[in-house]
From Swiss-Prot:
Residues 55-61 are annotated as: Complementarity-determining-2. Residues 94-102 are annotated as: Complementarity-determining-3. This is Ig kappa chain V-II region 2S1.3. Residues 24-39 are annotated as: Complementarity-determining-1. Keywords: Adaptive immunity, Disulfide bond, Immunity, Immunoglobulin, Monoclonal antibody. Residues 62-93 are annotated as: Framework-3. The keyword Disulfide bond applies. Residues 40-54 are annotated as: Framework-2. Residues 103-112 are annotated as: Framework-4. One of its GO terms (molecular function) is antigen binding. One of its GO terms (cellular component) is immunoglobulin complex. It comes from Mus musculus.
């Protein structure tokens, strides 16, 4: 199985500043066609996870363009350019390259 690794907590950030989340996979998530099957989800308190980014860098429908995704085959970053209070929650990266699909342990966004 592909192992997805994330830090449990982010560095505390101030509202209006940027935040970054890192994720590493134990195997490349890039297919031969060049598509990278790395997905990012946000689980807000008391809610189900919502898709933020698909195929490493594509913004899901309805997600503010404050969010962006980047990376390589195994190392990935989710960035929020201007953190808002509504962004609080746990951010998960996921391997949708091969079964079984696997998730990182999640990184909790900490606000100062």
């Amino acid at each position: 199985d592909i192992v997805m690794t994330q830090a449990a907590f982010s560095n505390p950030v101030t509202l209006g500043t940027s935040a970054s989340f890192s994720c590493r996979s134990s195997k490349s998530l890039q297919q031969s066609k060049g598509i990278t099957y790395l997905y990012w989800y946000l689980q807000k308190p008391g809610q189900s996870p919502q898709l933020l980014i698909y195929q490493m860098s594509n913004l899901a429908s309805g997600v503010p363009d404050r969010f962006s995704g980047s990376g390589s085959g195994t190392d990935f970053t989710l960035r929020i350019s201007r953190v808002e209070a509504e962004d609080v929650g746990v951010y998960y990266c996921a391997n949708l390259q091969e079964l079984p699909y696997t998730f990182g342990g999640g990184t909790k966004l900490e606000i100062k």
